[in-house]
């Protein structure tokens, strides 16, 4: 497994952007032994990994999912690449900035993906791409997934900010309600989470557009990392994968 910290000079952002990529190890098998060279060779060496773009919450950064949760372990166990990008506190959508370009949507959807697909053994196919996040990152996953449904097979939203952000001019609800052919949405929230109403509003909107979704409502949890760690693993296990590493 590789843990790669990358600082990329971004044209869409007008500055360098930090992100972390977890790339699982190639599977080895005792049957993959070449007696002539006395070496084991990698199974599926020409196959591409599926990808989860995993977004952090407010006040965190691209390291949060590896500091407070087991993102590396889940990536390795499930043979799935995970990319975590710094969204600062900007909610992952394009917005005006005085001295820089805060084009977070364009960066993720175009520049970041183009770099990942062109540099690493990662599949660009829709059926192999997923996006997920917690809180602010849950908003980002919803915003990206429903804005660009042809790019993602599934969305994971853990304790997402949603309707509570509308009064601040941050609106994903309109995008969800107008989405056609929405990806599968895995939604999770704890009973003690202060954003519980946001999750309930999202459920109503998913029903309104007749989207395929699963809502994991769990008693006893608040807005906390123990919950998000559990839900990330559940989300990965729920994916209906078709890639060679499933």
List the model feature ranges, each with a label.
Residues 1-246:
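Non-catalytic cap/lid and distal C-terminal segments of serine-dependent acyl enzymes
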């Amino acid at each position: 497994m590789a843990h790669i910290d990358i600082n990329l000079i971004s044209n869409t952002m007008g500055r360098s952007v930090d992100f972390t990529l977890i790339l699982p190890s190639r599977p080895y098998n005792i049957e993959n032994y070449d007696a002539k060279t006395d070496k084991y060779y990698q199974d599926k060496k020409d196959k591409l990994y599926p990808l989860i773009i995993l977004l952090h919450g407010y006040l965190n950064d691209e390291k949060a999912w590896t500091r407070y949760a087991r993102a590396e372990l889940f990536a390795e166990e499930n043979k799935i690449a995970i990319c975590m990008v710094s969204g600062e506190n900007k909610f992952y959508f394009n917005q005006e900035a005085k001295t820089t370009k805060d084009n977070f949507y364009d960066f993720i959807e175009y520049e970041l993906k183009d770099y990942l697909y062109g540099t690493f053994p990662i599949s660009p196919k829709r059926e192999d791409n997923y996006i997920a996040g917690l809180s602010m990152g849950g908003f980002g996953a919803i915003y990206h997934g429903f804005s660009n449904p042809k790019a993602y097979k599934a969305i994971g939203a853990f304790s997402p900010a949603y309707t509570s952000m509308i009064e601040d001019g941050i609106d994903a609800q309109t995008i969800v309600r107008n989405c056609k052919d929405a990806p599968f949405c895995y939604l999770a929230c704890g009973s003690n989470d202060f954003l519980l109403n946001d999750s309930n509003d999202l459920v109503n909107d998913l029903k309104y557009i007749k989207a395929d979704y699963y809502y994991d409502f769990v008693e006893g949890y608040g807005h906390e990392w123990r919950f998000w760690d559990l839900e990330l693993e559940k989300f990965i296990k729920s994916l209906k994968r078709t890639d060679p590493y499933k």
